[in-house]
Structure formats: structure tokens, C-alpha cells
């Protein structure tokens, strides 16, 4: 009797298994909710990890990341690019977005801080104690992001203007489209020094070294907001909440960012 019951039970179970689709197929059939995040290039490493952590905590959600210069990203949004979350490396760019009604004002919040540094290739013998030393003949190529569209370029320009060096050093500038391009140029030894954020130098500390911390007249604060044309504003808000959560802030801290 037991053997017969066992065979019947086994047959029924086998039929149920055949009738029930595999878990992987069920997961594939669930609708995936995407959130598209356009973020400043200096956030590349931190936001990549943040996105992965958010996805693990929110099954069925997918974070699509787009990095670039803050001004360039603003232009993309202004031209209708599908973006749900916008994160910049300065207040000025976010102010422009808000003035053009491209973001939801009440969703805007600062989530991180950074500092400006001057870097050189790790094997460089240069020693720079103050910006005036950038006049030295040994420094002929200086990587600096375009101030017209990149926040780190504006911070760098302001520091050089304050020191009375902007015009004199201009012939030595190698303009870049974003901070990671400046970092790349320095790491490959294609320029003598470059202006980047401390977090960028940290991300490539085996290939570049910080030769000077650059004081700025305004804090380097990072704002984030939901875009006005977001196709998934609820998920966008959840992602922003995650960035500001204890877990999100811990990830940012691991990458060298300060608290807002």
C-alpha cells in the first residue's frame, strides 16, 4: 500500500513539476521596472556600486547608469533624453535644470561632498606646495576640464583666477570633456598634472598621486533630483532615498565622498 501510494504521490508530484514553470522562467516573466540615472562622471565608481546594491535590495528593479560631464548630461535631458534621476557635481548645473523646469524641485537634495586636488603621475618627481609653482617650466601640460560645461573645470578656474594664474597658464591647458578624462590623461603620463576631485584620485591611486589639495571658495556639494519627464518617478524617488540611506551613504563614504 505504501509503495503504491508512494508511486502515485511521485507521479502526481512529477506532473505538478512539469506543469509548473521553472523559477527562472517565472522571474523572467515578471515586469522589470527600470530607473535611468544620469550622473556626473566623478560618481562612476560609487554609483555603479550603489546601483548594484539597490538592485539586490529591490528584485525586479534595474538601474541603468549614464555618466558624463554634468553640463553635457543637462543638454541631453534638455533635448528629451529619457532620464529619471539627475545627479550633478555642482549646484549651478542643477539650478539650470530647475530653472528650465527639467527637475522636480521638491525632490532635490544634496547627497555628498568632495574636494578638489591637483594630481600627477605616480612616478612623477614634481612637488607642488602652492599654485604659483605651476608656472615652472617643468610643467608644460595641465589637464583641466572645460569650465563651460564641467563643474570641476569651474572649481579649478575659480581657484586659478583667485591665485591670479588663469590667463598666464591658459596656453598650457589640455581641455577635457569630464573629470575622468583628466584622470586618464594624468594616469598615462600624457600631461604633467591635472585638476580632479579627491575621489577620482582615490579611484586610481596606484597610477596617480595627489601633489596638492586645492581650497575652494564654495563647498563642492552634489545634488540629486527626479526629472520632470521621468517615466517612473516612484522608482526614481526610491533610488534617491536609497542614495541618502545609511547603506547608500556608507557606499559613498567607501569611495571617499563626504556627507552632505
Residue ranges and their predicted role:
Residues 27-58, 62-67, 71-81, 88-91, ...:
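Exported/periplasmic ABC-transporter solute-binding proteins
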Residues 7-10, 128:
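Low-complexity, intrinsically disordered regions enriched in charged/polar residues
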Residues 9-24:
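Bacterial N-terminal signal peptides
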Residues 1-5:
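N-terminal secretory signal peptides that target proteins for export/translocation
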Amino acid at each position: 500500500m505504501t509503495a503504491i501510494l508512494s508511486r502515485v504521490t511521485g507521479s502526481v508530484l512529477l506532473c505538478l513539476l512539469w506543469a509548473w514553470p521553472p523559477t527562472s522562467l517565472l522571474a523572467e516573466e515578471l515586469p522589470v521596472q527600470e530607473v535611468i540615472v544620469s550622473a556626473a562622471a566623478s560618481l562612476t565608481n560609487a554609483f555603479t556600486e550603489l546601483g548594484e546594491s539597490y538592485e539586490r535590495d529591490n528584485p525586479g528593479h534595474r538601474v541603468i547608469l549614464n555618466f558624463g560631464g554634468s553640463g553635457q548630461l543637462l543638454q541631453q535631458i534638455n533635448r528629451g533624453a529619457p532620464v529619471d534621476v539627475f545627479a550633478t557635481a555642482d549646484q549651478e548645473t542643477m539650478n539650470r535644470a530647475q530653472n528650465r523646469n527639467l527637475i522636480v524641485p521638491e525632490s532635490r537634495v544634496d547627497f555628498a561632498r568632495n574636494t578638489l586636488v591637483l594630481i600627477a603621475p605616480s612616478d612623477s618627481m614634481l612637488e607642488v606646495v602652492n599654485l604659483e609653482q605651476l608656472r615652472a617650466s617643468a610643467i608644460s601640460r595641465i589637464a583641466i576640464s572645460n569650465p563651460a560645461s564641467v563643474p570641476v573645470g569651474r572649481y579649478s578656474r575659480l581657484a586659478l583666477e583667485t591665485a591670479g594664474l588663469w590667463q598666464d597658464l591658459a596656453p598650457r591647458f589640455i581641455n577635457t570633456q569630464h573629470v575622468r578624462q583628466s584622470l586618464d590623461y594624468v594616469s598615462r603620463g600624457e600631461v604633467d598634472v591635472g585638476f580632479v576631485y579627491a575621489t577620482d584620485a582615490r579611484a586610481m591611486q596606484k597610477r596617480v598621486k595627489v601633489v596638492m589639495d586645492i581650497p575652494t571658495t564654495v563647498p563642492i556639494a552634489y545634488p540629486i533630483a527626479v526629472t520632470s519627464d521621468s517615466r517612473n518617478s516612484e522608482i526614481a524617488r526610491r533610488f534617491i532615498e536609497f542614495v541618502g540611506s545609511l547603506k547608500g551613504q556608507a557606499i559613498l563614504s567607501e569611495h571617499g565622498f563626504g556627507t552632505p
